[in-house]
């Protein structure tokens, strides 16, 4: 029964993908070990090569045993196993989030090296329930409360074929097949809110919402018919757009697991049928992204979309232009949206970007601030710089590296640069944008700025493309 459900899920999620190989993330816990055995059956049946990936976060002594165990299972199944290591650098602040990002960076980079398009992960039904509860407590909007069984990370398709399978079924499968797994001791700690929620739901108790913050924020002016009720978005009637704090607590303050799953499905359906199509339309109609790594937002077209989608659009652009993997918080985006409604020109910094209003357009370009992007040596044929640009060398260029243009370098080569095309495209913000572009240097000399076709010698030939490490559950950048 379990395999049939898994097979139906994975075939539906993969759809028309023509795959000869696929990767799977396995930690040693019951969820991922069960996924490994299920995926192995499916891969054999469909003649697909399966690559097993484990990441050691170097935080628990047991993790080495887990990795060794997964390697042994992989060998017994005749599957290639890759063991990766996350370096936490003895920095334990916000460790869970950094470890998650580091894990996905490592795994997806390996997938790119192996020319694999899909990575399977073991997120199951209980994980989705816990995520919904946590996001509800953070006052997430409807996009935040929704869940997805497919998303993108580093241009790799992340697929979750266990999304509607409870953990109990996975454990039962392992026990019935006499398969061993490891329990992470940190999962029983009350230190993390997720664990508290998990333990309550596991006992069949109702989830009781922890109200750590005010439930509602001030709504934006206008757009009342489809307002987000300040982005809590758990209401069932989208047309009213208003609800009292008391009614929301009554509705979501106490919920059974079944009620949470039901609410999650309703939220997902609304996203899929209403907001996701609107988001895609908004990007197509109102957004222009240029190879120089900046973007324009048409504010006249932007104005017609719902507030939920407006927040997503701003975050979409901030992530792409900054090269960061995480979205800005709502409270950071809210002032920008309010400024837009005031119909006056402004210039702000947010999330590693400059946001500048020019008449009826919003220009967004990179801002380094105090943290300059790391220089990259061009040892291989290509390199990713600032998480945004891919630079490729088409000839031998020893001792060259990619960095940004300093004011000192700019003054030296200024008269040799043709900035007219960039000037026209950026509404005369060419100098600011120029300083955010990748340049190639040998020692202290600038030998190339590929974006503006500057080369100090005809022998050089470099290609550059705007390829941000974009992460989204709702849309994809390529």
Curated annotation (Swiss-Prot):
This is tRNA(Ile)-lysidine synthase. One of its GO terms (molecular function) is tRNA(Ile)-lysidine synthase activity. ATP binds at residues 27-32. It is found in: Cytoplasm. Ligates lysine onto the cytidine present at position 34 of the AUA codon-specific tRNA(Ile) that contains the anticodon CAU, in an ATP-dependent manner. Cytidine is converted to lysidine, thus changing the amino acid specificity of the tRNA from methionine to isoleucine. GO terms for biological process: tRNA modification. Its main location: cytoplasm. The N-terminal region contains the highly conserved SGGXDS motif, predicted to be a P-loop motif involved in ATP binding. Keywords: ATP-binding, Cytoplasm, Ligase, Nucleotide-binding, tRNA processing. It comes from Rickettsia rickettsii (strain Sheila Smith). GO terms for cellular component: cytoplasm.
């Amino acid at each position: 029964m379990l395999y049939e459900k898994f097979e139906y899920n994975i075939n539906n999620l993969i759809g028309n993908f023509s795959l000869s190989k696929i990767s799977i993330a396995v930690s040693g816990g019951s969820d991922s070990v069960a996924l490994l055995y299920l995926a192995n059956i499916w891969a054999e049946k469909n003649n697909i090569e399966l690559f097993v990936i484990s990441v050691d976060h170097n935080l628990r002594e047991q993790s080495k045993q887990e990795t060794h165990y997964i390697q042994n299972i992989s060998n017994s199944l005749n599957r290639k196993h890759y063991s990766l290591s996350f370096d936490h650098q003895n920095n334990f602040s916000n460790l869970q989030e950094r470890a998650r990002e580091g894990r996905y960076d490592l795994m997806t980079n390996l997938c790119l090296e192996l020319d694999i398009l899909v990575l399977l992960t073991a997120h199951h039904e209980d994980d989705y329930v816990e995520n919904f509860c946590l996001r509800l407590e953070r006052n997430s909007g409807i996009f935040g409360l929704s869940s997805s069984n497919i998303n993108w990370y580093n241009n790799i398709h992340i697929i979750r074929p266990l999304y509607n399978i409870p953990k109990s079924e996975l454990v039962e499968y392992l026990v019935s097949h006499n398969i061993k797994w490891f329990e992470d001791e940190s999962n029983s700690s009350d230190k993390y809110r997720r664990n508290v929620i998990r333990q309550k739901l596991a006992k069949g108790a109702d989830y009781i919402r922890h109200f750590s913050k005010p439930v509602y924020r001030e709504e934006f002016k206008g757009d009342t018919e489809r307002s987000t009720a300040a982005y809590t978005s758990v209401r069932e009637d989208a047309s009213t757009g208003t609800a009292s704090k008391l009614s929301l607590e009554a509705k979501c303050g106490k919920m059974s697991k079944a009620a949470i799953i039901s609410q999650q499905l309703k939220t997902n359906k609304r996203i899929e049928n209403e907001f996701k199509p609107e988001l895609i339309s908004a990007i197509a109609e109102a957004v222009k992204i240029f190879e120089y790594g900046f973007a324009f937002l048409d504010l006249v077209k932007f104005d017609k979309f719902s507030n939920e989608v407006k927040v997503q659009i701003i975050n979409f652009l901030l992530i792409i232009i900054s090269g960061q993997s995480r979205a800005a918080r709502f409270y950071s985006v809210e002032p920008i949206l309010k400024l837009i409604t005031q119909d006056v020109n402004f210039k702000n910094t947010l999330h590693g970007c400059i946001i500048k209003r020019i008449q009826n357009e919003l220009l967004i370009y990179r801002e380094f601030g105090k943290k300059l992007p790391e220089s990259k040596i061009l040892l291989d044929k290509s390199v990713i710089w600032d998480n945004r640009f891919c630079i490729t060398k088409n000839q031998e260029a020893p001792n060259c590296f990619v960095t940004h243009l300093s004011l000192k370098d700019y003054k030296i080569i200024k008269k040799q640069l043709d900035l007219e095309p960039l000037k026209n495209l950026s509404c005369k913000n060419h100098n600011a944008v120029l300083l955010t572009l990748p340049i190639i240097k040998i020692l202290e000399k600038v030998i190339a700025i590929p974006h503006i076709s500057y080369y100090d010698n005809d022998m050089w030939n470099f290609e550059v493309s705007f390829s941000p490490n974009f992460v989204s559950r709702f849309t994809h950048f390529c």
